[in-house]
Amino acid sequence: EYLSNIKVSGDALLNIINDILDFSKIESGKMELVEEDYAPMSMISDLGIMFLTRIGEKNVELLYDIDPTLPKTLHGDGLRVRQIIINILNNAVKFTERGYVKLSIKVEDKTEQDLVLAVSIKDSGSGIREEDQKKLFQSFSQVDSRKNHSKEGTGLGLAICRQLVEMMGGQIGVRSTYGQSSEFYFTIRQKISEESPVASLPEEKKTLQIGGAFSNTYLQENFERLVRAYGIEPIAPDVMAKDRPHVDFLFTDTLVYEEHKDAIHGSLL
């Protein structure tokens, strides 16, 4: 327990130091974007693992809505894009005790050379008062709208996000209903490094038998959409229950697994 507390305190201190350093660089005009190729889906996967760990024992689902036309490789400052998303996700997880945190990424205004990446993070937390929403992106601003939470950090996180988004020529904003939910969103233009959508898989891989069964309808629909993006038709839960086909990979959650573990093991044999 002591080691865990030390780690948490150390991480918090490191985040504060990083915020101050980034803010100082931006204010002095020394912050530079480092543009290079990056894989957005790989970034999203890493973030998923990171935040499932941070959610821990909370009764919160981490949901995704990813545009299937998102190219495999983009060209931009992927580390700063990741930093912006992490900062907003951190706040969403911190202020949501039950319900969901949803990361959505859409492709807009796409040309042969570039596209607009439209990112939103929505949560079912306690929301933010309208008068406080205007302060969120100001430097050293900490609002106490959110119930039962103490102020933490420097108050620089969202200000840094705003400045990074603006450096990329984009816009950032928030929509919130106090007592219900919040949605932070931003848009940035990114170059397309390789016109290769996430859907691309070698032909021999498209014969894979992939099934999915989730207790949550939203998760089920998103799973099927992502699998179809790879050119594979997923095996639906009713087909698996009725015909018991062989599947190479089966994705499920704990509730479904515990209820149907015998049938699941039979399909994978």
Tell where the protein language model's regions lie, with residue ranges.
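Helix-loop junction within the histidine kinase core
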Residues: 24-35
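Glycine-rich ATP-binding loops of the HATPase_c
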Residues: 169-175
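Disordered, acidic interdomain junction associated with two-component signaling
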Residues: 65, 87, 110-114, 131, ...
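Short alpha-helical segment of the dimerization/phosphotransfer core of two-component systems
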Residues: 8-13
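Short alpha-helical Gxxx[C/S/T] motif in the catalytic ATP-binding
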Residues: 152, 157, 161, 173
